[in-house]
A protein has these predicted regions:
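Short, Lys/Arg-rich N-terminal segment immediately upstream of the first membrane anchor
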Residues: 1-4, 42
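Sec-dependent signal peptide recognition
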Residues: 5-12
Length: 241
């Protein structure tokens, strides 16, 4: 098998093995990974806790963004065959007539500062039940009965559950997928495209403007995430991919 064919098969495997669905295999692997997760509750010093939190998440954020960059390079180079490109378009919920240029507008990185800030806010700096036991640092929901974990304070009229993941890697991967294909974040992707087209830096504070639909508090959420980025000087990580 030549390298080009292997590359296409590898991407197809990646698509079908990724956590597209919330109800993935979850058991011994999840338990083992939970043991390896730092106990942020026990770190009483706020500065130390934040440092531990960023140190835990940042390597995986860099790894996942690097995978996206590699995929973008494969698309640009023309190394992917028609069936692989078709599978990618389906995976990202795009029309089959989508051009490679349009595909690249969807498949792109998310700044590390934005990921870290959202994870900090959504998981209470890694101390939430969903972060500790289910590797969900981003408050990601699913809506099919049994797809995840039922929140303790869910209202009677609500049907959502919290997505559970077997590892931090799968949690971040799914978060990036959500940002890149969910219609709720179309504005974020347009901001990112504008930055790309004009050769401007892709920053967390800039892309946060497209997160008004991420939480029920609307634009207050945008301002909160931007404040976390600025206060913790997270912009320093945006160019370390």
């Amino acid at each position: 098998m030549n390298d080009l064919k292997f590359k296409n098969l590898l991407i197809i495997f990646f698509i079908f093995s990724s956590p597209i669905h919330a109800n993935e295999f979850w058991g011994l692997e999840a338990w083992m990974n939970s043991i390896r997760t730092p106990n942020f509750d026990q770190i009483k010093n706020i500065k130390t806790r934040k440092e531990a939190f960023f140190a835990y998440l940042l390597p995986e954020i860099k790894r996942q963004n690097s995978k996206i960059i590699e995929l973008r390079n494969d698309i640009k180079s023309g190394r992917l065959d028609a069936s692989t490109l078709s599978a990618l378009k389906k995976y990202y919920r795009l029309n089959t007539q989508t051009t490679n240029t349009e595909l690249l507008d969807t498949i792109d990185i998310v700044p590390a500062s934005l990921i870290l800030a959202q994870a900090a806010y959504e998981s209470n700096w890694g101390r939430s039940r969903f972060a500790k036991y289910y590797h969900n640092f981003f408050g990601l929901w699913c809506f099919k009965k049994g797809c995840g974990v039922v929140p303790l304070r869910r209202s009677k009229d609500s049907t959502h559950e919290i997505v559970k993941f077997s590892s931090l890697s799968k949690g971040i991967e799914y978060y990036l997928l959500s940002i890149n294909r969910n219609s709720a974040y179309d504005i974020l992707r347009k901001i990112r495209k504008h930055k790309r087209d004009n050769q401007q830096p892709i920053t967390g504070t800039g892309l946060a403007e497209g997160l008004e639909n991420y939480a029920q508090i609307g634009y207050d959420y945008v301002e909160t995430v931007q404040a976390i980025i600025r206060h913790n000087k997270l912009g320093q990580y945006d160019y370390r991919i």
